[in-house]
Design a protein with these regions (language model features):
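Extracytoplasmic/periplasmic substrate-recognition and gating elements
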Residues: 73, 150-151, 155, 192-256
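Long, aromatic- and glycine/proline-rich binding clefts that accommodate carbohydrate-like moieties
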Residues: 251-299, 303, 310
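Ligand-binding "clamshell"
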Residues: 12-20, 50, 99, 118, ...
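Conserved N-terminal structural module of periplasmic/extracytoplasmic solute-binding proteins
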Residues: 1-16, 26-31, 164, 177, ...
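Hinge/lid segment of periplasmic solute-binding proteins
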Residues: 6-60, 198, 267-270
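Short helix-initiation/N-cap motifs at beta->coil->alpha
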Residues: 7, 81-87, 159-172
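Short helices/loops that flank or line small-molecule/ion binding pockets
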Residues: 15, 69-70, 88-95, 166-178, ...
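Glycine-centered hinge/linker elements that transmit conformational signals in sensory
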Residues: 89-91, 130-162
Length: 337
């Protein structure tokens, strides 16, 4: 058994190194597949219908805001339904305190990819033959981020540094009253002071509903294991993903439970009364998107990484950066199709 992200688990499955878990599920009359959040469960299937992985827990990027900054600027977090609402809030925060960043997206492509998905954008055409990362939905979102950071100066990013240095600098700004909020991982909750910050879901874009990615961390069953070992692995998968264990995991780590009924566990219900932020990732994941597989082995994501730096750090136009990324990504896709 191993705990892996989706790309690595799928790669092992493509090499026939992990077993199909479906026969174990089919033979288990007590198994309740419908209680698993669909966005996490469905990431375990390949295109041939093989169930190559079980979701162990999930992660999704949510919004953390500085309670005092919002209050001082007269902002009600419940009123932020769109990225345009967040833009207006960031402007108010900057007007109230010119030394404070209105909002800090996390450096890199993923926050902007989430916003694109919430704008109705896609990575591929429906037939999977064309990369669509320079469509109007993409350009609109990425150009807005460029404008907010470089022209309006209502947002900022931390970039570079050693390892996760940029991530913790972003968090520190919000905790030190230097930023109105930031976009970060559900797993950040263990590092945050919720007397100073609160959590909310990512908003939609314009008239489009919120649809950020929700990623599963997966448990796989190794193909060469004995029948007895495989049965034991299946039992552990069920045990780890029981509502009670999912509740404990979520409360202690901030990561997202993969079972809907986790919300009915008494300890979790009591916990979320005092820690409402723990419910935000679970609620967001219920309408989250599955990040599509990059069939090029990562070259499409690499092209977007370069484009994100050009937009966020260098201030290049989104159209220019995404047109270049589109060309690179399409060539990579054509080479494997």
């Amino acid at each position: 058994m191993a705990l892996l992200d989706v790309d690595k688990a799928r790669n092992l499955s493509n090499k026939d190194l992990v077993a199909d878990i479906q026969p174990y599920v089919d033979a288990d009359s007590d198994f309740d597949k419908d209680d698993y959040l669909q966005v996490f469960w469905n990431q375990g299937y390949d295109t041939n219908g093989k169930l190559f992985a079980f979701p162990a827990y999930g992660t999704t990027q949510i919004m953390y805001y500085n309670i005092k900054a919002f209050k001082d600027a007269g902002i009600n977090a419940d009123d932020i339904r769109t990225w345009q609402d967040l833009e207006a809030a960031a402007k108010k925060i900057r007007e109230k305190n010119p030394d404070m960043a209105g909002w800090e997206p996390m450096w890199g492509k993923w926050n902007m990819v989430d916003a694109v998905l919430s704008n109705g954008g896609k990575v591929f055409s429906d037939d999977g033959k064309t990369v669509t990362i320079n469509s109007k939905e993409w350009v609109e979102v990425w150009e807005s981020f460029r404008k907010w950071i470089h022209d309006d100066k209502i947002m900022k990013i931390h970039s570079g540094g050693q390892g996760w240095e940029y991530w913790y600098k972003t968090i520190d700004d919000v905790l030190a009253d230097k930023a109105g909020g930031y976009t970060g991982s559900s797993g950040d909750q263990a590092d945050l002071d919720f007397t100073k910050v609160a959590a909310m879901e990512q908003p939609g874009w314009g008239s489009n509903a919120s649809a950020p990615t929700a990623d599963a961390l997966q448990l796989v069953m190794l193909q060469n294991s004995s029948d007895e070992e495989k049965q034991g692995v299946y039992e552990f998968m069920k045990y780890f993903t029981s509502p009670e264990n999912q509740a404990n995991w979520s409360m202690n780590t901030g990561y997202v439970a993969v079972r809907n009924s986790t919300q009915k566990v008494d300890s979790f219900k009591e916990y979320t009364k005092d820690h409402p932020q723990a419910l935000v990732p679970l609620q967001q994941a219920s309408h989250g998107s599955i990040l599509p597989e990059d069939p090029t082995g990562g070259k499409i994501w690499d092209a977007l990484t370069v484009a994100a730096d050009e937009v966020e750090i260098e201030g290049k136009s989104a159209q220019e950066a995404l047109d270049k990324a589109q060309k690179t990504a399409q060539e990579a896709l054509d080479a494997v199709k």
